[in-house]
């Protein structure tokens, strides 16, 4: 009996040491095992944007585009709305968005850990370029940009090209920042609200996207009539749609085809136009590089 007991103990010890000797067989209960990745077709595709006009003006067309993508892809698509360009960049940088509608400024300022690539650009009225309008109240005595020095100026967003950065680049020539040039600045977060702020004399001036201004002329002519344009700043490429670089190649190709053909769907044309988009076209990455260099120069000046 004693011999049998010893043999049982030795066998148990052998099993124990065999298990400990093989690292792969060791179960560490301090670690959380990752759940198996769901097939791409089962996971929602996350599409993110930040509104350039008031949310009530912008959200509806993006909801329609999200539903359209879900229908064409045959899988769930989740829309995420962020308040501003910086929040949107952070979401993309964290890898929490598969597709994002970035503003021109947000794209040229992007330096996130998550690599991204261009998928499409917006075309409006036959062009992929837009201008920055500097506006004042219709009854203002201000006639040019120089006369805005020391005045109150409304910006849209710190990373909006037409709503901030274009003015930064204009003042870069004088090695000045807007904080040094204007008496006071504030942010409205939407182009239409910047127009409203100037029209109601909350700001002496503002910088806005010419395409948004022209859209407001059509949809709210009473508001547009209360402001006037005193300057135009350099043209810039429209904001792009980007995707995570590590998204499956076949998914990227499918998304390209859907976006490029979206305007061919008669039901989607008015949806796109309400978001100041005529169609999506293949991107030209070279158009953004000069702005990226200007942004870096602006950062250096701001840090001095």
Model-derived segments and spans:
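Extracytoplasmic/secreted proteins, especially bacterial periplasmic and envelope-associated proteins
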Residues: 57-64, 68, 87, 91, ...
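Short helices/loops that flank or line small-molecule/ion binding pockets
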Residues: 86-100, 113-114, 146-147, 190-211
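Pocket-lining segment of extracytoplasmic ligand-binding domains
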Residues: 151-250
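C-terminal motif of bacterial Sec signal peptides marking the signal peptidase cleavage site
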Residues: 16-19
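An extracytoplasmic/periplasmic, membrane-proximal ligand-sensing/linker region
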Residues: 21-48, 54-64, 236-238, 242-304
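Acidic, polar ligand-binding/catalytic clefts
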Residues: 90-147
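Bacterial N-terminal signal peptides that target proteins for export
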Residues: 1-9
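Bilobed "Venus flytrap"/periplasmic-binding protein-like clamshell domains
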Residues: 42, 47-70, 82, 105, ...
């Amino acid at each position: 009996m004693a011999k049998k007991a010893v043999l049982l103990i030795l066998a148990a010890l052998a099993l124990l040491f065999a298990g400990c000797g093989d690292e792969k067989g060791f179960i560490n209960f301090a670690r959380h095992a990752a759940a198996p990745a769901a097939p791409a077709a089962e996971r929602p595709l996350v599409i993110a944007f930040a509104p350039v006009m008031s949310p009530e003006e912008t959200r509806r067309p993006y909801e329609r585009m999200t539903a359209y993508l879900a229908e064409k892809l045959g899988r769930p698509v989740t829309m995420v709305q962020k308040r501003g360009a910086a929040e949107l960049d952070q979401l993309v940088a964290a890898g929490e968005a598969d597709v994002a509608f970035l503003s021109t400024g947000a794209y040229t300022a992007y330096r996130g850990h998550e690599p991204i690539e261009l998928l499409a650009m917006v075309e409006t009225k036959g062009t992929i370029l837009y201008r920055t309008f500097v506006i004042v109240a219709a009854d203002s005595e201000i006639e040019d940009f120089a006369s805005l020095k020391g005045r109150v100026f409304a910006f849209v967003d710190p990373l909006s090209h037409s709503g901030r950065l274009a003015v930064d680049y204009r003042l870069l020539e004088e090695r000045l920042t807007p904080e040094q040039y204007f008496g006071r600045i504030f942010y409205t977060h939407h182009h239409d609200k910047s127009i409203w702020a100037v029209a109601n004399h909350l700001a002496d001036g503002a910088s806005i996207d010419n395409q948004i201004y022209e859209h407001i002329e059509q949809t709210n002519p009473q508001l547009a009539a209360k402001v006037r344009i005193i300057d135009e700043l350099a043209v810039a490429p429209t904001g792009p749609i980007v995707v995570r670089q590590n998204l499956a190649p076949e998914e990227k190709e499918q998304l390209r085809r859907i976006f490029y053909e979206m305007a061919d769907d008669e039901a989607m044309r008015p949806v796109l136009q309400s978001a100041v988009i005529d169609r999506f076209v293949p991107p030209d990455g070279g158009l953004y590089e000069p702005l990226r260099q200007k942004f870096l120069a602006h950062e250096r000046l701001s840090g001095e």
